[in-house]
Design a protein with these regions (language model features):
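Conserved C-terminal "lid"/linker of ANL adenylate-forming enzymes
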Residues: 20-22, 29, 76-162
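AMP-binding/adenylate-forming catalytic core of the ANL superfamily
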Residues: 1-85
Length: 162
């Protein structure tokens, strides 16, 4: 699939619930993406909807949040389908990352640009899951906290169809 990832990512980040998006599709059969939710916007939405959560990891794993993100992606896909040159860029699968992409973890530059090559390596297991028939994937990664300490994050990540 020939596509411009930044174009899709910027369309997705237009939604207040999506803080960051990373799209994949180069030399793949279809386009997929990682989504980072905006904890403040989605947290406020969750409170209004009565969806309880204990933090980012918990909120990002909620089915209601996945549906909210799916609605945003569906709107982007509808726009893409209106342009014949962009029909091949329709997003078919996505996942909500259990952690925020962070410059301290080398996933973003200090100016918040996605470091694609690093993400392709660090999140290979999740990218592979997007292009397989599984509907979830166990994931573990190192994280750096604001005070410089490091830790580990384990999560079962849902793979969702658009």
């Amino acid at each position: 699939t020939l596509f411009a990832p930044q174009f899709l990512e910027n369309k997705l980040k237009f939604f207040p619930y999506i803080k960051e998006a990373v799209c994949f599709g180069d030399q793949k059969d279809f386009v997929s993406c990682f989504i980072n939710i905006d904890i403040d916007a989605v947290g406020n939405w969750a409170e209004k909807k009565g969806v309880g959560y204990s933090g980012y990891v918990d909120l990002s794993s909620k089915l209601e949040v996945a549906e909210l993100v799916k609605d945003c992606i569906s709107e982007v896909n509808e726009d893409l389908l209106k342009e014949k040159d962009l029909k091949g860029s329709v997003i078919k699968k996505f996942l909500v990352l259990p952690k925020e992409l962070d410059a301290d973890d080398d996933e973003l530059t200090r100016t918040r640009k996605v470091r694609r090559n690093f993400i392709n390596e660090k999140y290979k297991i999740l990218i592979d899951a997007l292009y397989s028939s599984v509907d979830n994937c166990d994931f573990e990664t190192k994280v750096t906290f604001e005070d410089g300490r490091t830790g580990s994050l384990k999560a079962n990540v849902k793979i969702l169809n658009c």
